[in-house]
Amino acid sequence: MIRLVLIYTLLFSTLVSSTGCDKEALAAPETIAEKEYYVSSELIASVPKSMLQSLAKTEGFGAYVNEVKYGVSVYKLQYFTTYQNKEIKASGLVVVPQNMTTPAPVVSAQHGTIFSQRDAPSNFTSLTGFELFAANGYIMLMPDYIGFGASKDIFHPYYDQKHSALAVVDMIKAARKFYKEKNVLANDQLFLVGYSEGGYVTLAAQKEIETNPLHGLKVTASAAGAGGYDLTAMLAGITSGATYTYPAYLAYVLQAYNYTNSWHRPLLEYFQEPYASRMPQLFDGNHSGSAINRQLTTDPEELFAPAFFAALKEANEELTLKQALQANSFQDWVPKSPTRLYHGTSDNIVPYSNSKITYDRFISQGAKYTELIPIKGGTHSNSFVPMLQSLVPWMKAF
């Protein structure tokens, strides 16, 4: 993951010359909303330009060394957001270029699925690579998501549209107060980018911003890769009888919905033994996805409780779950901002067809600035870099 983040950062380095120097700085007066969302910030690292250049070299991206223009300051940001209609504290990582005199564009980057608390961005146990993003003149925001960092006592609301969106949007708003406090100049550009779960979270945040003008935000452009945007279609694939190579995702969704919606169903209603008894320990925040997978099975019929699995196949059973999956799919909204959906055509974790279905729905409902970009032969693990390579020239136009 760290290597992917580094690639993510470096590939955007050429954008700064066209997006960072000629935009109007945000100079709006502080609002009540900003005061309410912002909690605190803590400087956790200061990385000089020379170290970032060395990092680029050691990771095999020597060609980008000259694009490292600034050292960076890395902050942990705490802010208020909402979970189950109650105010909670959340956290994320903010990386800003040092001594930059021109207003910088803001990029909110939504990370892919994580299981371990150690992987929360704001823990910053080592250089992540996103420091290089800021070294090229971007203000980098990366929310931990609810369930990680400051909100680690909550079970992560995985693939829940409302909570995914608010974790991003509230951090963006809280960051405005942070900019003023630290004398950071931000221009009026806001990019949203994410892959896998981050792709889903990106669209959730975009939808929230575009449908709720009270946030006072405007998306410049959005790019989402390989997210499970149509959860009902994902369910159909799971019940088809085919194996699923990453069962940790399936267990994650069911438990997240059970917690987030306060259904309080026993795990034995969802999973067979020995898997049901393993779930609390496997999802305690100390295990990686790979470690969880090794303790589960790739056969959904063996993973799920027989009665539950049979009910999933019936149109009039497990309606509460199915309705929740439908409500958290993107079936009642059309992107207004320029939007790209990227997806590898050989993805066996989140099928390419999921993005195609979502794209076709957007177009049929009147989307004017949405594109579907297939990555031919790409899998879930290797389509991230081609996505970013394609994004560079596209984003230069804004």
Please state what every model-predicted region is.
Residues 23-101:
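Catalytic-loop region of hydrolases
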Residues 340-347:
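Short beta-strand/loop motif that positions the catalytic acidic residue
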Residues 158-181:
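Alpha/beta-hydrolase active-site loop
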